[in-house]
Curated annotation (Swiss-Prot):
E.C. designation(s): 6.1.1.5
Residue positions binding ATP: 596
Name the UniProt record assigns to this protein: Isoleucine--tRNA ligase
Motif ('KMSKS' region): 593-597
Free-text note regarding domains: IleRS has two distinct active sites: one for aminoacylation and one for editing. The misactivated valine is translocated from the active site to the editing site, which sterically excludes the correctly activated isoleucine. The single editing site contains two valyl binding pockets, one specific for each substrate (Val-AMP or Val-tRNA(Ile)).
GO terms for MF: aminoacyl-tRNA deacylase activity; ATP binding; isoleucine-tRNA ligase activity; tRNA binding; zinc ion binding
Organism: Lactococcus lactis subsp. lactis (strain IL1403) (Streptococcus lactis)
Domain of life: Bacteria
Amino acid sequence: MKIKDTLNLGKTAFPMRAGLPNKEPNWQKDWADATLYEKRQELNEGKPSFMLHDGPPYANGNIHLGHSLNKISKDIIVRYKSMAGFRAPYVPGWDTHGLPIEQQLAKAGMKRKEMDLLDYLEECRKYAMKQVDMQRSDFKSLGVLADWDRPYLTLLPEYEAAQIRVFGKMAEKGYIYKGQKPIYWSPSSESSLAEAEIEYQDVRSASIFVAFKAKDTKGKLPEDVEFVIWTTTPWTIPSNLGIFAHPDYDYSVVAVNGRKFVIASEMLEAVAEKLEWENPEVLQTIKGSELEYMVAKHPFYDRETLIMNADYVTLDSGTGLVHVAPGHGEDDYFASRKYKLPVLSPIDNRGYYTDEAPGLEGLLYDEGNKVVSKWLEEKDALLKLEFFTHSYPHDWRTKKPVIFRATPQWFASIDDFRQNILDEVERVDWVIPWGKTRLFNMVRDRGDWVISRQRAWGVPLPIFYGENGEPIITPETTEHVAKLFAEFGSKVWFEREAKDLLPEGFTHPASPNGEFTKEKDIMDVWFDSGSSWNGVLNERDYLSFPADLYLEGSDQYRGWFNSSITTSVAVNGVAPYKAVLSQGFVLDGKGRKMSKSIGNTIVPKDVTKKFGADILRLWVASIDTESDVRVSMDILSQVSEVYRKIRNTLRFLIANTSDFNPKEDAIDFAELRPVDKYMLVKFNELVKQIRTAYDNYSFMTVYKSIINFITNDLSSFYLDFAKDVVYIEAANSPERRSMQTVMYVILKDLVKILVPILPHTAEETWTYLEHEPENFAYLAEMPEAAEIPGSEELLGNWQEFLDFRDKILKALESAREAKLIGKSLEATVTIYPNEVVRTLLTAIDENVAQLLIVSNFVVANEPVNNAPESAMKFDDLAVLVEHAAGEVCDRCRRTDETVGHNANEHLKMLCEHCAHIVETEFPEILEEGFED
C-alpha cells in the first residue's frame, strides 16, 4: 500500500471536458423519449398555474440570435416556474400568414396572378409548414422544452375560427368600419400597412418652398399676395386642395423683389435667410384666424386651394403655412374634414400617377418630384429647391419607401375604447417601468387601425355585400363563417360562392333578390397574432386567460403587445396579460446591428456546434436583456471560461461526495462543524437571492450570484481548504462527514438551481447523484430557503473572520515575496490581536490553521503594540509569519515537529495526526509498512 492509498482522493467519471456539442443532442433525445415535458406537467397537475404566452415568431428562414435570446429566456422562466411549484405549460406558436411567404414563392417562380388561387394558397401553406418544422428543430437544439407536438399556428383551422370570432365581437360592438382615408401604403408590396409594419431609414429627399397666388382674400389682404408653403413631398402638390394656418399665430405680408408673400411672422427671419431675401418689408400683420376661408389658386392646375385653420401647425420648420393634400396625409385628412374637402389621391396600387393627375399619368410617384418642381419653376411658383437627409417610413418587409395614400380600407376604430386600453396599460405590471410609458403613448397617439390587406395569403375578412353594395357583418354571419373555418380552414372562403358561405336561409334587406358578394381583402397579420389570447389561451382547456406574462423584443410595443391589448380590451374589457417584459436587440461585439452585408452575423447553429447550447444559454443569463446586448465569438469564448469554472466546481463536489450516502452519512445541522454551518447558511442565503431573482426575471442576478458564490465562497475559501478535510481525515470521521453533508446539499441544490439555465449540464450532473429519487433533475423541486435561527449573527461573525483572513493572506504573500516561505503550508502564523479579534476567534471556534492552510496558527498573549518589528501591522492585529519548525508530513504536507518521532518505523514520515488516522484505519501498515 502506498501513502496515497490512505487518502480519500475524490473519484468520479464526470468528465472535465464538457463535449457539449456532441452530448446535447443525446440529452434532447432522452428528454423526448422520456416525455420529460409531459411528465413535469403531470407532476404539477392541480398546482397554481403560470401562463407564459409565446409571441409567435414569423415562419420564414432559420432562427437568428434574437430568436435564441427570446426562446431561451422563456425556457428559463418556464423551467424555473415548473420546478417552483407551478403548473406552467408552454405552448410555442408561429405566425404563418403574410407577405414574406408570398415573396418567397415569387422568388421560387410562383406568381400569384398566374396561378389558380387555391393552388397558390396551398403552396403558401406548405412553405409555412416547412419553415415551422425547421425552426422547431432549431429551437429544440437550444434545449427548449415545450409542447412541440401541439404548437399553435395562425393557419390552423381552429385558430382562424377563433380569430374570426374576435373580429365578429368587435364588429358587433360597432368598432369595425369601412372608410377612405390616408393610410400607410407600400407600392412595393401593393398593400396597406399598419403602424407596426413601418420602420424608418434615412433617405435623401427634395424639399421645396412654393408660392400659391391668392384668388380671394376677402378684402383683408392685397389681392396680389402669395401664400408660401414648404414641403418635403413635392410629388403631392398635384393633390393639393388647401393650406393650413394656425388660428393663433401672427402672419406677415412682406414685400420682396416686387412680390408680396404671406408667412408666419415668427418664421420671417429664418425663411428670409433660406430664400436669400434682402430687406423684406413687412406691409401688414394678420391673425391666422383671419386667413380662414381665403382662397388661393393651385400653382399649375385650374382649381382652388382653400385656406383653413388647424391647431397642429407648428413653427419648428417651414413657413407656418402647411400644404394640405387630404389624400396623402393623416393630419391633413382629419383637420380638413370639417371643411368638407374631397379626398384626392391620384396614385395607384403600384405607386404610379393616375389620370386624376393630368400630365403625370403612368409616372412613378417618386419621379413626379422632378416634373412637379419643373412645372412650378415654369409658373414662377418655385421659390427654392434643396435636398436634405431625413428619417422616412419604409415597409419593414420589402425595405422600400411607403407613402400615405387614401384608399378604401377596413378599420378598427380605437376611439370608442381608447381610454379603456389606457386604463388597462396602467393596471398591467411592467417589469421594465418605461414599457408602460412607451405603450401608453403609442395607444394615446395612434389613429384607427387599418386591418385590411390587399393580399392573398391570410385570413379573409368575413364580410359580405348586399346587392346595393352595403357591407353585411352580423353575429349570425361571422359565427357561421367561424364554424366553416374551424371545419375546413379559411380556404373555404375562396372555394365557395358568397351564398354558400352564409347560413342556410339567410336574408338581408340589402339583398332583396338573395344575391350576395364577399370581401376580397384579408386581415392584417397583426390581427392574426393579436388574437392569440383567444385562439390559444381561451381555446385550450389546460391554459388560462389572461396570461401571466408576455415576453418579447422591445419592437413588440408597437406590434404584438399593442395589437393584443387592442383586441382583448375591445372584446373582453381587460388586457390579455398581467405582466409584460421586453428585451433589447442582439448586436455584434462592436455594438453594430447584425447584417449579412457587413458580414457580422452569428448563426445560433454555429454557436451550438462550436460551444454547445448551454454556453449560449449561459450567455443569455449573463446579460442585461432589458437593453440592446452584444455578442461575438470572443464574448462567447469568455462565457465558456465561466462555464468551465462551474463545471469544475460540480466535478469537485461530485468526486468528494462519491462515497457519501445522505441517508446514512449526513450530519444534523446542530452537529455540523462551525465552518460547515457557515457554508450551509451562506448557501441558504444564495438560494434566497436566486429564488427572488428568478421570480423577478433577473437572470443576470441569478448568474452573478452563482458565479460569485462559486468563485468567492467555494473556490477561494471553502473548497480551498476542503482537501485537508475530505482527503486527509478518516473516511467516516465526523469532520469529513460534516463537510460532505454540506458539499452534498450544495451540489444537489446547485444542480437544481442550474437546471433552467444549463439544463444539459445539470442533467448530466444529476446522473451522478445516485441517491436522488428523480430520474431527471427537472423533475425535482426547486430548493427553498430555510429559516435558520441565529443565521444573521453567524454570517456576521464569519464575514469578520473572512476580513481577518484577508489580512493573514496579505502577510503570507509578503512572506512569500521575501522568500521566507514557499507554500503557505510551510508557515507558522502568530497573531497579536486586540480583544475584538480574540472574541471573534473564540466565537467561530475553529481550527484556524486549517482554514488558513498553514501548518501552525498561534494567538499570542501579547497585545498588538508588543508585536515584533517584523510583524505586519493592521488596526486590530499584527501578523508574524515564520517558517514552520519540523519536517513535512508525507501524507498531509503540513510542516510539523512530530514528523520523524513516531515509535513505529513505518509511520516516522507522518505527523502525529496522520499517523493516528493510519493506525486506526489501516492497521496493516504497522506491520507491513508503505511501498516506496
